[in-house]
Curated annotation (Swiss-Prot):
Positions in coiled-coil regions: none
Protein name: Transcription factor FapR
Residues of the signal peptide: none
Organism: Bacillus anthracis
Encoding gene (name): fapR
Family, as annotated: Belongs to the FapR family.
GO biological process, one term: fatty acid biosynthetic process
Length: 197
């Protein structure tokens, strides 16, 4: 039989978990620590840790509208909460009724792809970025009500080919649900005639 953690030990672990993953929900924390949601909320209050919505706002303190060059922010699928152009970016996508199949409540795959692809475009430090090629993998179905956190990282800038490689990994909680590798053309490599494509 597993020994129950002391309140102090649980609160220390809860604080570490939230610092590692600020997007974790109270429900996920309750499941992880095998306590009620009310206990998690009381622990957060005692530790002065804000609720999820406030933590997300805190992480998203940058003015991303000024940061993103390659497309209007409203065209990004999901909400960008962190971005450093030509390096990395993070977005959150809430799966709602309009994103799922009615009969099984599973998210339509094109929404996960669109979140990852638009994040790969947004992270490029150019006025125009186009997806030349992508390799994607759906690891498990995402369901109604789940929150998908996509993390994009610029892996390689191939100047001789005029491409930038962006890898995107999408998570629900700590579980990997989608991966994608996107080869991106940059505006400096794009011609009106499409000769460089």
């Amino acid at each position: 039989m597993k020994k129950r953690r002391s309140k102090k030990e649980r609160q220390e672990l809860l604080q570490q978990t939230i610092e590692t993953n600020p997007f974790i929900t109270d429900e996920d924390l309750a499941e992880k620590f095998q306590v009620s949601i009310q206990t998690v909320r009381l622990d957060r209050m005692e530790l002065s840790i804000p609720e999820l919505r406030e933590r997300i706002k805190h992480v998203a303190t940058k003015q991303h509208e000024e940061d993103v060059k390659s497309l209007p922010l409203e065209e990004v699928v999901g909400e960008i909460i962190d971005i450093e152009l030509d390096r990395h970016a993070i977005s959150i996508f809430e799966v709602k009724v309009e994103h799922v199949f009615k009969r099984n409540q599973i998210a339509r795959g094109h929404h996960l792809f669109a979140q990852a692809n638009s994040l790969a475009v947004a992270v490029i430090d150019e006025e125009l970025a186009l997806t030349a090629k992508s390799t994607i993998r759906y690891i498990r179905p995402v369901k109604l009500g789940e929150r998908v956190v996509a993390k994009a990282r610029v892996e390689d800038v191939e100047n001789d080919k005029g491409r930038t490689v962006v890898k995107v990994r999408s998570f629900v909680g700590e579980e990997l649900v989608f991966t994608g590798t996107f080869e991106m053309y940059r505006s400096s490599n794009y011609s009106e005639e499409g000769n460089n494509l």
